[in-house]
Amino acid sequence: MNKLINIGFGNVVNAGKIISVIRPEAAPVKRMVQNAKDSGSCVDATCGRKCKAVVVMETGQIVLSALLPETIANRVNQRESIESNEVFQAL
């Protein structure tokens, strides 16, 4: 089953399709975001706020979030620990 992770302001992404969550300050990341915007494969989920995390998806899409990368990573890890506990309890 696909698990959805909240990336802020009611926006969610499929946790199983996330490749990386990175900070947008580095020049190569800025170029990657600009290229994605130019090609139409960028999803801006910041609701007008400053972008603090760039989520790279398996599909090649880039998702911009106003949450910190650490916050998104904690939410993904929290989902994984809940899943592993459910599997352990089923045994």
Curated annotation (Swiss-Prot):
Species of the source: Lachnoclostridium phytofermentans (strain ATCC 700394 / DSM 18823 / ISDg) (Clostridium phytofermentans)
Name this protein carries in UniProt: Putative regulatory protein Cphy_2880
Family indicated by similarity: Belongs to the RemA family.
InterPro entries in the cross-refs: RemA-like (IPR007169)
HAMAP family named in the record: RemA (MF_01503)
